[in-house]
Each structure stands twice: as structure tokens, then as C-alpha cells.
Amino acid sequence: MIATPLKHSRIYLPPEASSQRRNLPMDAIFFDSIPSGTLTPVKDLVKYQNSSLKLNDHKKNQFLKMTTFNNKNIFQSTMLTEATTSNSSLDISAIKPNKDGLKNKANYESPGKIFLRMKEKVLRDKQEQPSRNSSLLEPQKSGNNETFTPNRVEKKKLQHTYLCEEKENNKSFQSDDSSLRASVQGVPLESSNNDIFLPVKQKIQCQQEKKAPLHNLTYELPTLNQEQENFLAVEARNKTLTRAQLAKQIFHSKESIVATTKSKKDTFVLESVDSADEQFQNTNAETLSTNCIPIKNGSLLMVSDSERTTEGTSQQKVKEGNGKTVPGETGLPGSMKDTCKIVLATPRLHITIPRRSKRNISKLSPPRIFQTVTNGLKKNQVVQLQEWMIKSINNNTAICVEGKLIDVTNIYWHSNVIIERIEHNKLRTISGNVYILKGMIDQISMKEAGYPNYLIRKFMFGFPENWKEHIDNFLEQLRAGEKNREKTKQKQKTGRSVRDIRKSMKNDARENQTDTAQRATTTYDFDCDNLELKSNKHSESPGATELNMCHSNCQNKPTLRFPDDQVNNTIQNGGGDDLSNQELIGKKEYKMSSKKLKIGERTNERIIKSQKQETTEELDVSIDILTSREQFFSDEERKYMAINQKKAYILVTPLKSRKVIEQRCMRYNLSAGTIKAVTDFVIPECQKKSPISKSMGTLENTFEGHKSKNKEDCDERDLLTVNRKIKISNLEKEQMLTSDFKKNTRLLPKLKKIENQVAMSFYKHQSSPDLSSEESETEKEIKRKAEVKKTKAGNTKEAVVHLRKSTRNTSNIPVILEPETEESENEFYIKQKKARPSVKETLQKSGVRKEFPITEAVGSDKTNRHPLECLPGLIQDKEWNEKELQKLHCAFASLPKHKPGFWSEVAAAVGSRSPEECQRKYMENPRGKGSQKHVTKKKPANSKGQNGKRGDADQKQTIKITAKVGTLKRKQQMREFLEQLPKDDHDDFFSTTPLQHQRILLPSFQDSEDDDDILPNMDKNPTTPSSVIFPLVKTPQCQHVSPGMLGSINRNDCDKYVFRMQKYHKSNGGIVWGNIKKKLVETDFSTPTPRRKTPFNTDLGENSGIGKLFTNAVESLDEEEKDYYFSNSDSA
């Protein structure tokens, strides 16, 4: 807002349109008529009056129209809008009024004359209202909201600019120049309608105090209606009664709203509320303070300073003539009594302020109320809180309680440090105050603050007796968590510096390839001729690592892309005799993609479990890990390595098809040009494969380096990709090899339970100078390929590839790699049982001198698989075992089937299968256990057939039934013959019917924590409940049926027993099974008789009534369908 402090009492500024501005007095000078950068003392302002009176009519929109809600009263303000503001901002700091000249010239009128003049002005404005309406312009549509001043009592227009400069003892108007410079300099000459001139009642009453010479004026605003309070920014819903004074100051506050709030004790607090974040702004240069003026019954109108609480604010004691002491807060330096301030800022007004949390109201509460509560505390020393909660203070070393005050509504109060528990709801603080906790703890606020549930339960109804122990444990956890976060931040900062160090070390390794193995960041680079290591600079993809193999006589140039979440060490080995003269340069890159990092230092193995499967980051590690956990090679060991690293067998799986390459490039967000270049580079070279690599269907590509100096081409130089970290044991520690190998092999079963985990175990052995022939090596390798092809029936995530067993001169490297594509998943599996003896035989045949236990890392190909198949421990395309089937059927029987996520819950209960697999398996075999036996029987037969043992199968197929009819041997031959028939040709009619698919098993009940559950543990043990709940039912008593007969059957014993029984009862005549004694079924529901009264009858004679059960069934059978073995026509 632009306001000029007028120094003459008869001058007033009506905010009229341009047609009425011609009636302005001589001393009214507008700022826009003063050139910028001009020093304009007050006495020289008169010469600018002509320019100010010659304003054009297009300047009408400089004045804003302020309307009421019903548009009946129109208020105007002398505020310039932002649209017509001059581009040159006015330097008000140059205005230095002549204090001496103005001191004696000020001639002020009495308050009575001022009121009479204002009343006349209101009546005159009411008569001229139609003419003004035609000349008013619409307000500018800016981002600021308009402040509506409702007044529906009388239809009168009030003037917004009131100048009531009252001076006691004819004191001059003084302004602090320094404060004006701090607040006004550099601010553009613009304003908006959110400088609040609080509405004044149209029937202005002159409330003169008892002592008239004091000229104390109080202008009383109308009490607003409940519906008209929504323009206030200070909790209009709390029935805020707004009152203001047309007093000696004009209140301005940048980005603030001046409003008044009434408390219960008729104390009016004028708050300065920030419109942006509902907090006070500590800007003294833009917030003006006033003296408090008595209103009505002596209650005080206190204007709050720009601080949040009343603590620390400076107050004055101004003695008024009526003898009352009125406290006033001063926000500007120096004496600011009875002053009017010029502010050229553009405050921003947001009428609807986003509401904060309930707990933040305590920061915005009126200072006067806090002062009243504080005074009450000093007297009573007892505070009652409701909706209370616990908060940690003093860097998690103590606690306090916070809650709503019962005496004052909607005011939150927090205590000092709690030191003593008087009762469960009565506490004493360090300052001596007593806090009484009413009701239960505020659980919602406690959970939002991050407190654990067990602590909330302990303090649910108050403080327990051992509250100190619980609080100390909780605060200790908080402090430990902060320390861990600080350490993590430091490691992250250190990791950023490692990236720069790695780049510089890479360049140094190119130039100086001597003695760099003992650095923290090294590169394994055995250069020979034109063999180079090219690392992509990751301009398009920062996380993907590309290694291009370049040779002088290149035929194979596959582009390798390491899997995600895999920590790589790259070794490039050159050929020939130059290896002995070169130094080992190591570069180790680590990547920690998640919190789950488990390091086993004793076994020299590390397991990285990744939560984010598809994160592509640069492989970084902090310096402390590099330096502390890395064992550098000694000079003797490096020389020994350089001699013995002549033979290394590399396993590389390049991407064959163009589509797969494009998908892999798209995963790492490479550009289209890069994808095309990579595809064109890889596809032609893959077509030029060597004959050895073409013969390998499962390994797809193999490089064998340094077989001999003249026999092998340079394209067999290897690029060996290993995981994690290479450690060389001392030459004398040969006995540690066996133990470490056993530890490695023990971890192999765990691979089946961890999805996307790729384990590489790398053993380096001593090689002798004599070389094996190329033919023998090729033959062994072809045998290894044949073994891999035979075992591709086992489909799993892990691809365990064991390279061929080498003689003493070769370096055997058992490698476990992850397949690059889904097609190769079926080709890269060897059973674990075969993996162990192959490695053991290798260790026995070759003299092992060096050991390279490498870590297990987590790799992921999430995009190529179903998103629901990423559960940990998921085993894909593997046959179901008995345990999984049992879990499947128990889960299917217990879980409710009408809910949408039924199969997902079943898969979660099984734990190792996807929902699709569970559904497919249950639909294939809903009864479960029957077909599983056939599957387990087929497995060894298939494995025997795959291993070439066809002789036994041929013998079984040529079995002839030669035994006589009715003999035990005949029965066994028939059973063997039937078992060898192809079972795949027979379809199970009942498993394929639609009714069978729609069969729904009765679900059992979920686990319940209640002890009074009617059906306890139904899902765990789905058996018939006890007869305590259900009525007694008499079941048929068959004396010959025992629990042992209901179990599994041994065929050999059963056949012998049945045959002997058959032979023994043959002479008696009749059906053998009909001679078994049976007790008649009773129909009454009497209490079952004890067992001691019904002893077991060993006589299985004619008295048995079991034949009556099967009479109808036996008679209905045809003669052709009678059981051949149990009929009377059996021959001896």
C-alpha cells in the first residue's frame, strides 16, 4: 500500500476516481508523479502537484474496489494496483523530513471535530455513490484473494484512509529513517488489496474517556456474523469476534493478515499470522507495533509482535492519563509512539490457508493465552492435560508430555523434562510442576511420530511403575539409530570421492602398469599386443558396464553386459610368454544396492541380497571397505601368479538374437543409435563362430586362452568375469583348501532357495610346464558338453556350469553363471549331486596351490520374467515335492475362496511358488498325493535313460508272464508288467471333468487368538472335533481293522500274507474275505462301551458278519469281472 503521512489535519485523501481527483487539496501529492531517484524533501513536494492533477483517465484502475458479500456497500482504497505501477521504484529512503521545520507547524484538530468531519464525509459519499459507481473499474484478477469486509447493518460507505494523528504535548511526527530504509528501499511501487484496513462501523461513535484532554480515541468495529467470518485467516470457525481500532497507526505486514481474536476474558489479541505457513515472520521492519488502548470494560487490546511466543519480546509501560498501565510491544528500534509508517511492499493474502496438524496449533496460539497459562502455572503448579502423548527432547536424552489443556480449549501444552512418577497419571517435571494426565494416550499421534506399538501399549493408560526402564531403552534405540544414519551419510560422502579416485587411477594404470596392485582401486589388465579394456563412460547408461574385446585377428567380438546387482572384477589375459614380464593391475568395483549386505570374512565369501532388482548404479564402495577387507598380494605371490596364470578357461554367454540384445539395451536406457550400433556389432560376429564354439549348444561360446604358443589363435584369449574379490592364500596353507571347499559346497543347497542368486566359485591350481595335446582337451570338452545337454531337464534359476576336468597343467575353474536369456535357463543346469564329485575329482587330480574363493552375488533378470515370480526362494519350473503339495492343499482348504486375492495368499502360504503355478498345479491334480507318486517313480527311470543305461529298460520291457495262474510269482509279474506300461496314454476321466474342476473343498477356520474358539486349530489339524461339542455318533466297529492297516502298505509282505491266507482258507469253501467276523452296526446313540469290556476276538470264522456289508456288491459283479486271485477257482 502507498500512504503518505500528511502533516496537516485539514488534509484528507478521498480515494475517488480521476474525475474527483481534481478536487484534491494542494498538499496531496501522489508518488507516481515524483520522478525516481529524486531527493524530495517535504517542502519541495508542492511543485509536483500539477503533474499529479494531470493524470489521465486511464489511471482509473489504480484504485481498487472493495465490496461486501452482498455488493451493497462499495469501499475504496488509495492503493495502487500492480498493473499500472510505474516501472521505476521509488527510493523512499531518500525522503528525510525536516524535523525542526515540521515540529511547530503541525496544527491538529480535536477528536470531536474530526468525527464531525468524517460523519459529513460519509453522508456526502452516500449521496455521490451513483456517480462513483460509473467511474469505478473492476479489480485486477491477481493471484491474491480479496478481503471482503461485510457490513449488512447499514448501507453506508466508509472511507478507508483515516488519519488520526494525535500528539500529546504537541509532539512532532517522527520516523526512524534507518527502519524505513530497511523496509522500503528497493521495493517496487505497487500494492494490493490485502493490506488490511479493518472495517469500521458506519455509525462511528466517539468514545472519549473520562479525561478529555488525553484525546484517547477508540473506534469500535461491528461484530461480524458467523457466516461472514470466512475471510479471516485466524480460525474463523472458533467464533472469532473481530474488533479493531481506527487509531494512530496503520497496520501493515508483509505476507500477513492482521486480525483480532477474542478470548474468554475479553482480551483481544491482534495476531500477525503468516499466510504461507501459518507462522509468525520475524520481520521488524515491516510489522508495526502499537500501544494498547482500553476498550469497554478495561480489557486490553494487545498487538502481538512478530515472534511466536511472548517470551523474549520487549515491552513498554506507557502511562496513560487515566492512570492505567498499558503494555505495548515495540517492533521497530527507537521510539515509535504515535507514529504512522509507510510501507511499499506487496503482501500476499491467502484467505483459505491449508490447515496444519492439530499439534501445530500450539505454535500459533495467542501469546496472551500462553501468558495467562504461564501465570496460572506459577500459582497452581498443576497442569491437567488430555489427549496427551510422549515426546523425546534434548537430543533423545529425556522425555516430556504434550497434550491439550483442559482449562483452555484447543491449546496444546508440553511439559518440561519428566523426572518422577507420582501416580500412573500424575507426573512431576524437573521444574517442580505436576502434570495430571486425563484419559488415554493419543495413539494416532504417537504412531504418526514413529513410536513403536509396544511402547504405546505400555503407556496406554498412564506411566507404569517401570516407565524409566522402557524410556531409557527406547531413547537408547533412537540414539543408536541416529549414529547409524550419520555413519551412512559419511560413507555415502566417501563413496562419491571414490568415484573420482577410481577414474584417476584408471588413467594412471594405463600409463604406469608397474607396481599398482597395492592401491585401493586397481585393474586386472594383462595386455598382450592389441588386447584392450574399454570401459564405457556411461553417458547414456550410468549403471551398465560394457566390455568390448578387441583383437588383432578378431573373429569373436561379443559385447558383454554384466547383470545388475553384480560386483565385477575384470581380468584380461594376454597370450604367449609376455605374461611373466607384466605386472598385475587390479581394479575392484563394489556395488552395494541395498541394506542387506552380509559379509562372511571367515569363509572369504560375501552374499549380497538385493531388494531393488532393477537398479543400475555405478559400482562404488567406500574406502574403508577397500582398505580394510582387501588382502594385497605380495611381490612373491604376484610373480607366482604371473607364471601360473597361463591357462584359464572362460565362459561367456553372448546374446544371440537381435531382439534379446535390443531388450537388454532398452533395459539400461540406451539411445536408439547405441542400440543399433551394438546390435550390428554383435550379430555378424556371432555368425562367425569358431567350430568349437558352434559345437557347444549349452555353453554357447567358450574362449580358451594360452593352450600353446603356436596352436591357438589370438581370438581364444580370454575375458574372465568373476564375482567380487580374489584372495590368494599362502603357498604353505594347502590344508585350508579342503575346509574352504567344503564350506563352499555347503552353500550350494542354499542356491535353490534364493532367487536370482548366482554363485561363482573359482579355484586356481598350480600348472606344470608340460602341456596336454589339443585333441585330448577337445575330446574332454565335448564330453562335458554332452553331460550338460543330458541334464538340461532340471530347470532352475541357477546355472551351474562345471568346465572340463583338466590335467596337472590346466587351471580348473568351476563357474556358476546366470543365464543371459530365458532360453538358456533350460540349458544351464547341472544337478547339485553331480557338481560335488566333479569338483572333488578335480581337486584330487591337480596339485592345488592357490585358492580363489569368490563371493556369491545376486543377479536379476526381472524384466524377462513374470512380476509375480519375484518372491524370494522361488523355484521356477521345478517339480513339486511332497512338502509343497501339502502346503498347497492345506492353504487351499483353509483360505476363503470368495476373496479376490485367493491364489496370491495360497502362493504366500506355499512360499516357493507363484500364484499361477499353484493354480495350475491344483487344477492338474486337485487330489494331490496320488499323481505325485507316479512323478517320483518316473524320475529315476528318466535319469537312467538319459545316462545311457538302456539295457535294464529293455530287459524290463521283454518281461513275459510265465508263472502259473494264482501263484504269488504270477501276481508279481503282472504288477511289474502293468507298471511298465506307458501311463501318459491313459487319461484320467475324473480329473478332466468340469465337475472336478469346480469341486470346492470345505475351508477350515483361521487361527484365532481367542481361547474360547469353538473349533480350535481346524486349519492345522482338520479332523473331526471332539464329541464334547457335537453329539455322539456310533461308528461301525470292524474288529479286524486296526490303525496299522490304514497306513502305508508294503507290497511284498502284503502279497505273502494274502497268499498264505488264501491257501489256508481254501479248504473251507466260500469267499475268503467273507469269512471275516464283523460286529453289527448299532443305530442308537448310546455312550460307547469301554474297550476292556469288548476284547478282541481272534476267531475269524463263520460268525463274522462282514460278508453282509459286501453281499450286494459281490452279487452284482459279473463272472468276468470277479477278482481272479481271491475267487475259489484259484488253482494251486
From Swiss-Prot:
A GO molecular-function annotation: DNA binding
Residues that bear Phosphothreonine: T653, T821, T1087, T1089
All residue ranges annotated as the SANTA domain in the record: 383-469
Keyword Nucleus: yes
Cellular localisation: Nucleus; Chromosome, Centromere
Bias (Polar residues) ranges: 130-150
Region of interest called Disordered, as start-end residue ranges on this chain: 123-154, 306-332, 482-518, 765-798, 923-957
GO cellular component, one term: chromosome, centromeric region
Site of covalent link Glycyl lysine isopeptide (Lys-Gly) (interchain with G-Cter in SUMO2): 7, 65, 211, 262, 534, 612, 639, 647, 727, 742, 840, 899, 956, 964, 983, 1079
Domain annotation SANT: ranges: 875-930
Alphabetical list of CDD domains matching this protein: SANT
Domain of life: Eukaryota
Task of the protein: Required for recruitment of CENPA to centromeres and normal chromosome segregation during mitosis.
Entry protein name: Mis18-binding protein 1
Source organism of this protein record: Homo sapiens
